[in-house]
Amino acid sequence: MGCLILVSGVPGSGKSTFCAKYEERGKVAVFSSDETRKQLTGSYTNFSREKEMWQTLYNNAYTILTRFPEMDVILDATYLSENQRLKVWRNFCEVADDLCLVQFQLDPNLARKQNESREKVVPGDAFDAMLAKFQPVTAEELNYYGSVVIVRNRDTREVLKYGNCSRHIDWL
């Protein structure tokens, strides 16, 4: 089976850019909460069907991991809290060969600036609320993920744990 790569970070931190670059390498399916929400509701900002959105996102990822073992899967969402990230681990730990966490910990001012210059702008007050909820990777999470990478900016990354999945993110 393939690896599951979970990207985490506030809006504008580079998650979707990372996913797009990874997708160019082939043999990967990217499932985005924003894109799934838009497919279901017609809008990135319509949160009326969140439960269905998450079920769809996870079902799609599960299908790829179980039917196409040569494929990797990336889940592109904010995953701001440890609880959110561990829920993903619990759902996929027996399905994926390895799970990798790539967390984007950019300077908040840079992330805010990048958020404001993208198509899917998160309003300032909502961005601030998300920033306040953001939890950096915890020591406990290192026990769960095979690989953990922190991206601080375009030129700086820190590998906290290097496992099987790392072969897929060495190019970062």
Q: What are the roles of these predicted feature ranges?
A:
Residues 74-76, 102-105, 150-151:
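Conserved beta-strand segments of the P-loop GTPase G domain that flank and frequently precede/overlap
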Residues 95-114:
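Conserved phosphate-donor/acceptor-positioning beta-strand/loop module used by diverse small-molecule
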Residues 49-100:
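Glycine-rich phosphate-binding loop used to anchor ATP phosphates in small-molecule kinases
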